[in-house]
Design a protein with these regions (language model features):
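Short functional hotspots at interaction and active-site rims
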Residues: 1-146
Length: 146
């Protein structure tokens, strides 16, 4: 089974904890109005990232469909079962057609069940690592993944 999903990573990951003198509040500086994030689409196979792509734009139907056709399908093992959540652009007919023509099966998770999508845990681990180490997004997902 191959789990597919996307996630957004803020350009800057502010620390969630800090140190101060006992009894004094800890303050930090961060521009919360700052714009910009990197969107990531990835596929998880047997607990490891099969492929990851980074985008400096919003993920939409066209981008997701192109990623499926150009990146994911060529890397999938034969007769894979591809599992996605219910995002509107996941349910596009061209996505289904591309996977089925390549001999794969597409399944959708029940609505509002991110806990069933194993790649969600990988995104959580990546965001946690990024917060703790302040690692760049390019270093977080070195290419190639495998």
């Amino acid at each position: 089974m191959v789990y597919v999903d996307e996630s957004g990573f803020s350009k800057h990951q502010p620390r969630t904890h800090g140190y101060s003198v006992k009894g004094k509040r800890c303050y930090g500086k961060h521009n919360w109005g700052e714009k910009g994030s990197t969107n990531v689409i990835g596929a998880l196979l047997a607990g490891a990232l099969l492929t990851v792509s980074l985008f400096e734009t919003t993920i939409n139907t066209d981008i997701f469909t192109a990623w499926i056709k150009q990146d994911l399908v060529p890397k999938l093992p034969q007769s894979s079962v591809v599992i996605m959540d219910n995002a509107a652009f996941h349910k596009n007919q061209s996505v289904k057609k591309a996977l089925e023509q390549a001999g794969h099966i597409l399944l959708f998770l029940p609505p509002y069940s991110p806990d069933l999508n194993e790649i969600e845990h990988k995104w959580g681990e990546a965001k946690s690592k990024r917060r703790k180490t302040q690692i760049s997004i390019l270093d977080l997902f070195p290419l190639p993944c495998l």
